Amino acid sequence: MEVLESGEQGVLQWDRKLSELSEPGDGEALMYHTHFSELLDEFSQNVLGQLLNDPFLSEKSVSTEVEPSPMSPAPLIQAEHSYSLCEEPRAQSPFTHITTSDSFNDDEVESEKWYLSTDFPSTTIKTEPITDEPPPGLVPSVTLTITAISTPFEKEEPPLEMNTGVDSSCQTIIPKIKLEPHEVDQFLNFSPKEAPVDHLHLPPTPPSSHGSDSEGSLSPNPRLHPFSLPQTHSPSRAAPRAPSALSSSPLLTAPHKLQGSGPLVLTEEEKRTLIAEGYPIPTKLPLTKSEEKALKKIRRKIKNKISAQESRRKKKEYMDSLEKKVESCSTENLELRKKVEVLENTNRTLLQQLQKLQTLVMGKVSRTCKLAGTQTGTCLMVVVLCFAVAFGSFFQGYGPYPSATKMALPSQHSLQEPYTASVVRSRNLLIYEEHSPPEEPSSPGSAGELGGWDRGSSLLRVSGLESRPDVDLPHFIISNETSLEKSVLLELQQHLVSAKLEGNETLKVVELDRRVNTTF
């Protein structure tokens, strides 16, 4: 079994190169009147564009093909994953690699398979290193491009919508199945090391509810053949798994219907895929090795197509939700901008009102301050005036002549002198005579003046005044000294007796003593 499986792996590796040497334009013999591409959707046309490059689609035998040189590098097993459109220039149309012989039976497939398995032992494949960068043209890059669709498929898309009723009728008849992902890997002998992720250019798909290729590649027993196990293991192995999208889809046949003996009923999707790949449609059980391998291969491709459709659906839903969020955010942004503009306008108006109020308040404050200043000045002036009036009346008794008016009455009351009707002595003449030196002769003028003074003294005697002898007195003698406090000495004048005496004349000072006596 190890040699057989390794031989099959070699066939899978080398037929990708040999299929490119096949002649185009031979595949119209196996086509029905209604082409199979009309029954496929747009995604299946994209996916199955490169699936037709297979060893069973070539008319020529492998013995007539070009023998590969032992030194040429073996392509990676990723060639089986080239179910999407390839951007290499040598990618042919899906119709170019379909065989023209309608009598393609299982015996020829088995003989061809055994022939190739003996020519390519397993040791030669295992010893060859796997390069990170495969040669161009041998291993296509797995890239999905929606726009890169060939023109024959685009022209045949309208009939595809007309045949949807046939598919729905077939889906109601076919029972629901469940395909384990690791069963496909058991036939294809895949491992995670043989299919690195670096060569895949597909975007990461979101996690789906059904099984995918990654689940099948992580199978713990990839070398075990499913038909070598008892038939009772299939339902027990499928029981603990959760229900997936494949179990509810009628695109795949149930695994238990592929075992045993009897007629085999495949789904329409499996039949279309087998025809597109160039494989014969098996009709009875048990299946041969080639039929079993072909059926597992197309079942794997159908499951990958369903997974891609699910991922696209989820991606579309995600993008729709993002678009809705963007629209809502844009509308909200516009509303917020309008609100900001309204708030800015209100802020401007409020600032203008605030400035007006500030100017009004400042004007009122300045007026009140001025009024308060004038009122304060007026009050101070009134207070000063009141103080001036009060203190002026108080200090009026301290004038220059207070004794003549105010001090006379209390002094008169205090003395209480009796009224005398006798002669009141009111005035006194004080005479001070200076005797001339004896050697100077007396002039007649001076004698006349002395005679005048003598006559004055005689008048004083007549009036009753006592005359005093002429004696030299050192100072004046006041005869009446009764009321000295009330007397006011007034110096009326100083008489220059005579300027003609030439310094020898005597100066006479007449002082008047005024004595004011008031009577009541």
From Swiss-Prot:
Q: Which SUPFAM superfamilies match?
A: Leucine zipper domain
Membrane-topology annotation of the record: Single-pass type II membrane protein
Q: State the SMART domains in the record.
A: BRLZ
Motif S1P recognition per UniProt: ranges: 427-430
Any Pfam family matching the protein = bZIP_1
Regions of this protein lying in the Lumenal compartment = 400-520
Annotated region Basic motif: where? 296-325
Q: Which residues are listed as membrane-spanning?
A: 379-399
Its subcellular locations are:
Endoplasmic reticulum membrane
Q: Name one GO molecular function term.
A: cAMP response element binding
**Region labeled Disordered — which residues?**
195-264
State the residue spans of region: Leucine-zipper.
336-357
Modification after translation (UniProt): Upon ER stress, translocated to the Golgi apparatus, where it is processed by regulated intramembrane proteolysis (RIP) to release the cytosol-facing N-terminal transcription factor domain. The cleavage is performed sequentially by site-1 and site-2 proteases (S1P/MBTPS1 and S2P/MBTPS2). N-glycosylated.
Known InterPro entries for this protein? bZIP (IPR004827), bZIP_sf (IPR046347)
A GO cellular component annotated for this chain's UniProt record is: endoplasmic reticulum
Per the UniProt topology annotation, the Cytoplasmic ranges are: 1-378
According to the entry, every stretch annotated as the bZIP domain falls at: 294-357
Which residues get modified to Phosphoserine? S93, S191
Matching PANTHER family, A to Z?
CYCLIC AMP RESPONSE ELEMENT-BINDING PROTEIN A, CYCLIC AMP-RESPONSIVE ELEMENT-BINDING PROTEIN 3-LIKE PROTEIN 2
Name of this chain's protein: Cyclic AMP-responsive element-binding protein 3-like protein 2
The species is Pongo abelii
Q: According to the entry, what is the taxonomic lineage of the organism? A: Eukaryota, Metazoa, Chordata, Craniata, Vertebrata
